[in-house]
Amino acid sequence: MIKKYWFLMVYSVTAFSVWAQDTPLDTLVVTANRFQEPLSTVLAPVTIVTREDIDRWQVSSVNDVLRRLPGVAISQHGGEGQLSTIFVRGTNSNHTLVLIDGVRLNLAGVSGAADLSQFPVALVQRIEYIRGPRSAIYGSDAIGGVINIITSRENTGTEISAGWGSNSYQHYDISTHQQLGENTRVTLLGDYTYTRGFDAVAYGSTGMQPQSDRDGFLSKTFYGKLEHNLSDTWSGFVRGYGYNNRTKYDAWYSPGSPLIDTRKLYSQSWDAGLRYAGETLQSQLVSSYSHSKDYNYDPHYGRYDTSANLDDMKQYNLQWTNSVTVGHGNVGAGIDWQKQSTTPGTGYLPKGYDQRNTGIYLTGLQKLGDFTLEGAVRNDDNSQFERHTTWQSSAGWEFIEGYRFIASYGTAFKAPNLGQLYGMYGNPNLAPEKSKQWEGAFEGLTGGVNWRISGYRNDISEMINYNPHTLRYYNDGKVHVKGIEATVNFDTGALTHTVSYDYTDARNALTDKPLERRPKLQVKYQLDWQVFDFDWGITYQYMGSRYDSDYSSWPYKSVKMGGVSLWDVAVAYPVTPHLIVRGKIANLFNKDYETGYGYQAAGREYILSGSYTF
């Protein structure tokens, strides 16, 4: 279950909370400021999801995890594996930075937005999710927030799991994490997931050529990691993973031409690192390489036919991060270097291009009596748009024991991607999108109820848009986002209740029209309890109405999609100390709804699974 953390403030006995899984008091978070710190010292709103949460919810995709979290809205073109977009606090899908073990996810293609429908949930051991601007720490993209997917495992042992469900869903997984001697650990994982799917296009709503078919998804994953303690303070690791996905989807069709309706994605990532953990100094050096090849093609002609489209991206990263204990807090500093390379013919890029970025950052955290102060500044030197500086600051005031007020301000930016710069409609003179965000929050513990409420405003300028008349991208867009976010957690006997409320008003500042696919109102509720060894969970989500475009006519029309209430029920039972049987019904009342106009979501689905550990 998701449950509020109750942690001791550093150098204080007062506990503050965030929305997260129940865990020991000394749990640390690394994503907020790129160094380990008690979760309660972080002034930004933080959510942590553990592997236990993922198993309890019985989710089959990363998107199914994220949709349950505060501030997140997801739009998807059909079922599992179909194109999806993530909106955090009303910002664009490419305004959320996605990290894998602290390293930027290599984005297949040149869209600049992470499509997590393709990332295997089997690799996820933990998610740290930070809301608000974080460009002063991570650089480009971190306007709405940061999602850090962590793959490292802690508990030794071997697990075999299997699951079957609606739409011919099958899932098989085997993983092991073993101690080799006193100082060496090895992790291996293999995963196979398949679903026949359902027809992604909603009948009669898009004007598309009828394609009465099933749009299925197949994924094969492998993961390996080797860790070794060189001494009491020095350690190193090497890690590699890859996945091979195939997705069928519905696409526009012109008689006599190939029907491009199949996607084949190959992705591999390798990284190695060296860590030092002293009493006052922590330091880490990590290098990584990733390569993604994303084919879209007509299966009758094959992915090497001239009609096929290939997005081929290589990414190189080098990170050096440091943190020093100073006074009642710490100071952090580091350097990030990244190079992205495309091959000729990638997407709509006629040539191969490189883009390099070097970022230098400085962070600080101090506890001064009843006040906690946090700040960061970063300068990025990019091969395309040269230098860009961002900064942020936050202050927390414990005005009454157990109650705190937090105020923060931060700037952020989004660099133009390679497609916008050099593609068929590219403009090499594009400038980065810029953001200024304010937030104020109260949090506390009242009568056993752990709560937090915040209000925020985000002004984004220099938005990159496409001009259909000049056939070029350009900077002129402005967006204003205003929102209220509230989270509450409390227990009533054996029941644990977790509630979040999001009001998000995201509008085009020039036309005052709401931004597409973002619901203005969301309410999420998680109820967990255990009775007679049965572990029950009920998930409720209300998504308010949202707007989208109808592309079946010209000029395009704006359409309003109604709101929907969704219920999931999950139960698990330990047959033996090693064998657990699980069952789940998703979309219990079989609601018919869309999160992207013209693309239907899954109806009622059943999943039966089991796992054996030894």
UniProtKB/Swiss-Prot annotation:
It comes from the Bacteria. GO terms for molecular function: ABC-type vitamin B12 transporter activity; metal ion binding; porin activity. A motif (TonB box) lies at residues 26-33. Cyanocob(III)alamin binds at residues 83, 85, 92, 110-111, 251, 517, 551. Residues 155-614 form the TBDR beta-barrel domain. Its main location: membrane. A motif (TonB C-terminal box) lies at residues 597-614. GO terms for cellular component: cell outer membrane; pore complex. InterPro entries: B12_transptr_BtuB (IPR010101), Plug_dom (IPR012910), Plug_dom_sf (IPR037066), TonB-dep_rcpt-like (IPR039426), TonB-dep_rcpt_b-brl (IPR000531), TonB_box_CS (IPR010916), TonB_rcpt_b-brl_sf (IPR036942), TonB_rcpt_CS (IPR010917). Ca(2+) 2 binds at residues 213, 215, 249-250, 261. The keyword Acetylation does not apply. The keyword Endoplasmic reticulum does not apply. Ca(2+) 1 binds at residues 199, 211, 213, 215, 250. Keywords: Calcium, Cell outer membrane, Ion transport, Membrane, Metal-binding, Porin, Signal, TonB box, Transmembrane, Transmembrane beta strand, Transport. Residues 1-20 form the signal peptide. SUPFAM superfamilies: Porins (SSF56935). The chain crosses the membrane at residues 158-165, 169-178, 184-195, 217-227, 232-248, 263-277, 279-296, 309-325, 328-337, 353-369, 371-381, 385-400, 403-417, 434-443, 449-458, 473-490, 494-509, 517-529, 535-550, 558-572, 585-596, 602-614. It is a multi-pass membrane protein. Belongs to the TonB-dependent receptor family. BtuB (TC 1.B.14.3.1) subfamily. Involved in the active translocation of vitamin B12 (cyanocobalamin) across the outer membrane to the periplasmic space. It derives its energy for transport by interacting with the trans-periplasmic membrane protein TonB. This is Vitamin B12 transporter BtuB. The gene is btuB.
